[in-house]
Amino acid sequence: MNERDTGRQILTDLMGAPYLDQRDEQRNAFNAPLQDYSDEVCFGRVWGRDGIDKKLRSILNLAILTALNRPAQLKHHLQGALNNGCTPEEIQEILLHTAVYCGLPAAGEAFKVAEGVLRERGLIPVDSSEPTGPGARVDAS
């Protein structure tokens, strides 16, 4: 399998076949070089490496995309993180950790995006108002 095919398989495993199908439908002469770069380099060469597992790569992406305040890409990578074995509690802790290092505005936006994804997937109740996860309450003292 070449790097492009490897990348497309990893992308399918990460985001799901419907995501890749939609992306392929939007392919045109202008964006084709970027899609090829993404398939071959990002997913084929980097995500395809053995040094760290896919779950850890997803965790890194959640933190990086939160720091960069990229909600659209974060939404896709939240789906990928769940597909790679991250739990809602782990995602909550990852995003809470980013608040300290990236700031509350970036983390707040990430929490909104994550909450939407988790609700869409039925992983948190639509009407939940109680804190969840380890410790549930963060004590600022």
Regions found by a protein language model. Name each.
Residues 38-42, 59-66, 94-99:
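Short alpha-helical scaffolding segments that buttress acidic/His motifs in well-ordered protein cores
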Residues 1-55, 83, 109-141:
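Acidic, glycine/proline-rich low-complexity segments that act as flexible tails and inter-domain linkers
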Residues 104-108:
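Substrate/cofactor-recognition hotspot
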Residues 100-101, 118:
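Short Asp/Glu-rich motifs
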Residues 54-59, 88-94:
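Alpha-helical scaffolds flanking conserved acidic
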Residues 67-92:
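Mid-chain, well-packed structural core segment of small domains
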